[in-house]
Swiss-Prot record:
It comes from Variovorax paradoxus (strain S110). This is RNA-binding protein Hfq. The lineage of its organism: Bacteria, Pseudomonadati, Pseudomonadota, Betaproteobacteria, Burkholderiales. RNA chaperone that binds small regulatory RNA (sRNAs) and mRNAs to facilitate mRNA translational regulation in response to envelope stress, environmental stress and changes in metabolite concentrations. Also binds with high specificity to tRNAs. One of its GO terms (cellular component) is cytosol. It holds the Pfam family Hfq. Keywords: RNA-binding, Stress response. The keyword Protein biosynthesis does not apply.
Length: 81
């Protein structure tokens, strides 16, 4: 994946993780997973609900936060660090 992709993904996923935002993750096959993002790396997202699931990023179509989150503030915080 390109660096530009990481510059968008990491602050987005990190904000969802830090703020314990409930998310719906839609997979490319249409399955909907729900939970909170526990962790992530270049290839996978760990999604916690009643159990923790490892979801490969190449299988993810869309991530929808369960509530409004200010991502521009998170990008500024990460840039300042």
């Amino acid at each position: 994946m390109s660096n530009k992709g990481q510059l968008l993904q990491d602050p987005f996923l990190n904000t969802l993780r830090r703020e314990h935002v409930p998310v719906s993750i839609y997979l490319v096959n249409g399955i909907k997973l729900q939970g909170q993002i526990e962790s992530f790396d270049q290839y996978v997202v760990l999604l916690r609900n009643t159990v923790t699931q490892m979801v490969y990023k190449h299988a993810i179509s869309t991530i929808v936060p369960g509530r409004a989150v200010n991502f521009s503030a998170a990008e500024n915080d990460d840039a300042a660090a």
